[in-house]
A protein has these predicted regions:
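Active-site-adjacent segment of SDR/Rossmann-fold oxidoreductases
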Residues: 34, 162, 183-194
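Active-site helix of classical SDR
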Residues: 137, 173
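Canonical Rossmann dinucleotide-binding motif of NAD(H)/NADP(H)-dependent dehydrogenases/reductases
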Residues: 4-39
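Residue(s) in the substrate-gating loop at a strand-loop-helix junction
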Residues: 157
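The beta1-alpha1 cofactor-binding region of Rossmann-like NAD(H)/NADP(H)-dependent oxidoreductases
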Residues: 45-46, 76-87, 119
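SDR active-site lid
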Residues: 190-256
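Substrate-binding pocket helix/loop in short-chain dehydrogenase/reductase
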Residues: 113-114, 118-126
Length: 289
């Protein structure tokens, strides 16, 4: 039996999928600031390059970002391609001598009534949000248990902990990620590998404005539905994630209001069910105007 000893980011090697924007880019910034070497993996190679360049300058282009301590390199990666994910992991292990942290973060969303989704859209969100995470785990986990150390960090959502009508396909995939992460965590505990699942409420990234069907306003839906004035800052979330990984926490749920919502879901699921149904009705009426 090997106790879990979370890797110290200083000197660690990490891969961040979806690292070219949003939460992924914030994770890259936090990891490099902490001294890690980060492979910024993204389907959009130009975005990955931009993030890698920004975080490895004397001071990040983002105002108020911490001074640089680590390094970064870009890589083009389609997480739906299992062979490509495995090849990247093997390449990193070969060139860096190992992989300490794998952040399976890439994701997409659709918002609107479920009957509007085409089968291609269903398959796309499953391929990226579920299979993409599975491909990361399949490639990195065996290496980590062979070494007896490492951390898998899976980006889910509050939509993976609570029902979320009108983003049903997204919530389904994020429930799958939560189930994968918490179940694998039980297996990995005696093998020295930590597994942490990240479940934020609305984060201030471009995904809030993507995947909209038939007039669905994703940004308003998330903010009004969660009763907040502004979405969570991705850099604040990234700091919480690294703290959660360092503490070998099973779940990172942010912000505080999201943790309260999660508790309500567990304590009063019937009440939550009625609240969500009422909010779906309100959102539909607002979209119809």
């Amino acid at each position: 039996m090997t106790a879990v000893r979370p890797p110290n980011p200083a000197g660690a090697t990490a891969i961040v999928t979806g690292g070219g924007s949003g939460i992924g880019a914030a994770l890259v910034r936090a990891l490099v600031a902490a001294g890690a070497h980060v492979v910024v993996a993204d389907l959009d190679l130009a975005a990955a390059r931009r993030v890698a360049e920004e975080v490895t300058t004397t001071r990040s282009a983002r105002a108020g970002a911490p001074a640089v301590a680590g390094s970064a390199e870009p890589a083009r990666l389609d997480v739906t391609d299992a062979e490509a994910v495995s090849a990247l992991v093997e390449q990193v292990i070969s060139s860096r001598g190992g992989l300490d942290m794998m952040f399976a973060n890439a994701g997409i969303t659709w918002g609107g009534d479920t009957e509007l989704l085409s089968l291609d859209q269903w398959n796309a969100i499953i391929d990226v949000n579920v299979r993409g995470v599975v491909h990361c785990v399949h490639a990195a986990y065996p290496h980590m248990i062979a070494r007896g150390s490492g951390a898998l960090v899976l980006t889910a959502s509050m939509g993976g902990l609570c029902p979320a009508g009108l983003i049903t396909s997204y919530a389904m995939t994020k429930h799958a990620v939560v189930g994968l992460g918490l179940s694998l965590r039980a297996e990995a505990a005696d093998r020295g590998v930590g597994v942490t699942v990240v479940c934020p409420a609305a984060v201030d990234t471009a995904i809030l404005d993507k995947g909209q069907l038939d007039g669905f306003d994703g940004r308003r839906f998330y903010l009004d539905g969660q009763g907040v004035r502004r979405p969570l800052d991705p850099d604040r979330l990234a700091a919480s994630v690294l703290a959660g990984v360092a503490g070998n926490r099973a779940l990172v749920v942010e912000p505080v209001r999201a943790r309260a919502t999660w508790r309500l879901q567990r304590l009063a699921p019937g009440l939550m069910d009625r609240m969500i149904a009422r909010y779906v009705r309100t959102s539909r009426a607002s979209t119809a105007r």
